[in-house]
């Protein structure tokens, strides 16, 4: 399901949960009754992957880069990186692909010079002769993956939410403890080599957080980012967008 329609799908009752925290928080700020109940990562593994001919940031001027879309996490991270390396985004072309898999496909087919990717697509690209040019996922406070639920779901089906959270936390524990099996599953799921799956495993496990909570700094930082593009009340409490009462230790 396209990330952009997930908030409406959850309100309509077509799904019970979805994983994109940035999408969920953005929708909640816009007025939808959604809440973050679980966060997986300390930072996000977004990587700018390019052709081998790119040796310095300025080499990207006049080239095209694939991203999921405007105002998506890859877009925000890339804008922050451009600012860091002092490149104007107007000097670089963008291809909006609708998703990471499609961004990878655009890079692999040489429609673009670079793409903002996450594992396993960045590792898959490296195998095909591209290179990881820059980690961009640590430049902006943007929450990534976890669990978004509707407030109605939390209020009326708390047991289902609790069981889903517990199952996901158990899965993370299992992944940490079972490297060989996890790597094999990643390779089978994404049709990648064992070496690619190993690198993907290492990246994700290194970025898992320890308690399932979203740091207040990240939530506040993301609200500040949203304020750059639309009105967001200055007194909006970011902690009202989360409910971690069902995690171990409660609130």
Regions picked out by a protein language model, each given a short descriptive name:
Residues 155-233:
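Secondary-structure end/capping motifs
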Residues 51, 135, 150, 241-247:
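Helix N-cap / beta->alpha transition motif
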Residues 227-251:
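Conserved C-terminal helix/tail region of periplasmic/extracytoplasmic solute-binding proteins
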Residues 1-109, 113-119, 132-141:
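Short, glycine-/small- and polar/acidic-enriched structural segments
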Residues 27-28, 45, 124-125, 142-143, ...:
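Short secondary-structure boundary/hinge segments and terminal tails
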């Amino acid at each position: 399901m396209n990330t952009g329609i997930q908030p409406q799908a959850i309100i309509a009752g077509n799904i019970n949960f979805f994983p994109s925290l940035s999408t969920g928080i953005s929708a909640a700020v816009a007025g939808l009754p959604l809440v973050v109940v679980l966060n997986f990562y300390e930072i996000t593994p977004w990587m700018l992957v390019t052709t081998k001919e790119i040796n310095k940031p300025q080499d990207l001027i006049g080239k095209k880069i694939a991203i999921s879309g405007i105002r998506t996490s890859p877009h925000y991270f890339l804008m922050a990186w451009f600012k860091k390396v002092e490149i104007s985004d107007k000097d670089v072309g963008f291809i909006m692909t609708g998703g990471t898999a499609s961004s990878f496909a655009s890079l692999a087919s040489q429609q673009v010079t670079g793409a903002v990717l996450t594992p396993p697509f960045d590792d898959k690209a490296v195998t095909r002769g591209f290179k990881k040019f820059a980690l961009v996922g640590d430049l902006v406070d943007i929450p990534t993956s976890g669990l978004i639920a509707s407030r109605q779901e939390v209020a009326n089906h708390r047991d289902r939410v609790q069981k889903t959270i517990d199952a996901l936390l158990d899965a993370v524990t299992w992944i940490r403890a079972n490297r060989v099996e996890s790597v094999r599953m990643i390779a089978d799921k994404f049709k990648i080599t064992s070496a690619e799956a190993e690198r993907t495993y290492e990246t994700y496990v290194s970025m898992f957080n320890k308690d399932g909570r979203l740091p207040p700094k990240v939530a506040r930082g993301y609200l500040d980012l949203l304020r750059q593009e639309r009105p967001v009340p200055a007194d909006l409490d970011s902690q009202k967008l989360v409910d971690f009462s069902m995690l171990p230790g409660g609130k």
